[in-house]
Amino acid sequence: MVKQLIQYRCCLESNPTQEILNMGVPLRQQITVAKYLMKQKLGGVKRYPLVLMLEPLFRCNLACAGCGKIDYPDEILNRRLSVEECLQAADECGAPIVSIAGGEPLLHRELPQVVDGLIARGKYVYLCTNALLLKKRMDDYKPSPYLTFSVHLDGNRDRHDASVCQDGVFDRAVEAIEQAIAKGFRVNINCTLFQGESPEEVAEFLDRVKKLGVEGVTIAPGFSYEHAPQQDIFIKMRDSKQLFRNIFKLGKGKKWPLNHSSLYLDFLAGNQNYQCTPWGNPTRNVFGWQKPCYLLVDEGYAKTFKELLEDTPWEKYGTSTNPKCANCMAHCGFEATAVDDAMHNPLKAGWVALRGPRLSGAMASE
């Protein structure tokens, strides 16, 4: 293991323009994460988190077709995690990155204090938002290398507005993105793909957001939430893999700022046979610590992070063992697997980072 870690570090430091971890994140953040990973591996820690998924509320100002997070009565939608509960979750978990999701986090009146507290702890914060409130609330935050606004855009204007079931949202989000970038904020795009999208459409979208000047783009097929309002919009796993192969073919030489590890992109293209690592992205919300992951909402909750790790029957979950997981390729489950693979096989990860995913030939077994 020590040999692999040394190789991993050498690959990272000797080739900063083709990073092992990803292309859409500053080197300082990558090195912080790499050091954290090395500490866990050298310490013999079996299960450790990479990203804390913090959901301080479920209330949202949109009702998206593919969302399974807002199907609750008002008494639940009106609940909030306090500043203290949010910071305690970060302390319990210890992950170097915190993704604040929801619901719409900017509806939380005390969110600026949550963000300040996380940054004071040295956490890299991704504040997820549909951007409808971003222009109004932007001055509540200060530009920082530790803060990124992660704006939800599921494609170009017509596609995104249809996805969120409201006209005009795309244009308002783009205006907010441009304003945030002009003020010096880090901005990321979070894009989910659904049925009916062509490779050409997605490539055009990625070209557009690159021109906007965003730092990175996270992209994945939509997870088939049981509570989503529409159930016919999700993509089967094999179709997702072929879609990504075709997208990546169109992206040759374009240097899209995809905010993913090289091996996760290779997985999306059907070249890696991965099982998910749900404890890599644990979720804390108003109910507690969600079992087993951010996406499955009916599996129960733990009172503490320690209880989540020790009492969750992890063997019950995965694409090969649980029908609910059958078509999942979400980065919240598989990015941690890809990063762990890169730690053990740094030369393979480096090769894929240099050459890109294989886009033809047989796919890995599912």
What role is predicted for each listed range?
Residues 3, 7-140, 145, 341, ...:
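Conserved alpha-helical substructure of the radical SAM core
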Residues 59, 63, 275, 324-327:
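The −1 position to Zn-ligating cysteines in a subset of zinc-ribbon hairpins
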Residues 66-67, 71-74, 283, 300, ...:
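Cys/His-rich zinc-coordinating "finger/knuckle" motifs
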Residues 39-43, 267-271, 314:
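Short, P/G- and charge-enriched loop/turn segments at secondary-structure junctions
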Residues 1-18, 23, 81-82, 121, ...:
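Radical SAM enzyme [4Fe-4S]-AdoMet core and its adjacent flexible, acidic
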Residues 137, 159-162:
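Short, charged, surface-exposed secondary-structure boundary motifs
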Residues 4-5, 10, 48, 290-366:
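Flexible mid-to-C-terminal extensions adjoining Fe-S/redox cofactors in radical SAM and related proteins
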Residues 70, 101, 152, 220, ...:
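Conserved residues at the C-terminal ends of beta-strands
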